[in-house]
Amino acid sequence: MSIQNEMPGYNEMNQYLNQQGTGLTPAEMHGLISGMICGGNDDSSWLPLLHDLTNEGMAFGHELAQALRKMHSATSDALQDDGFLFQLYLPDGDDVSVFDRADALAGWVNHFLLGLGVTQPKLDKVTGETGEAIDDLRNIAQLGYDEDEDQEELEMSLEEIIEYVRVAALLCHDTFTHPQPTAPEVQKPTLH
């Protein structure tokens, strides 16, 4: 399966979010949408829920709504792809500092947990690998750094954390969208 839908550009999405006055960064919005999808909400109710969570229940303007639909479709496609094409939507480029990326990652994770929690209200009851991953995400959401730290070392650590978060999101998606039966399924004999 290939990704048919493309994500809007990060700066373009930032402009739409600022024009709408949502108070969210593109990374936070993507985290929220990703959390909702990973929690099992992949039907048409995602947009009104997003309005409730980010815009006091009011619909977004046309440009932002279109960009968010693209983001949702591309994210959903990437999460369902066997090639694991899902990536965190973080600022990138030469003009983006490692500190900006760390802040964006913390915002992404916080909003991912919000989206996941809205669709899976019993997150604290989740056990096993997924439960551990959710606990780790809660810790990552508190991510801090010292601006005196070696930026190269911080960049390497950040890349490892980003990859861990990506895999944790995929694990959540697999857990909540493909639930495992709690007891062995017993097939009843077919009467002819």
UniProtKB/Swiss-Prot annotation:
It comes from the Bacteria. One of its GO terms (cellular component) is cytosol. SUPFAM superfamilies: YgfB-like (SSF101327). HAMAP family: UPF0149. Belongs to the UPF0149 family. This is UPF0149 protein YgfB.
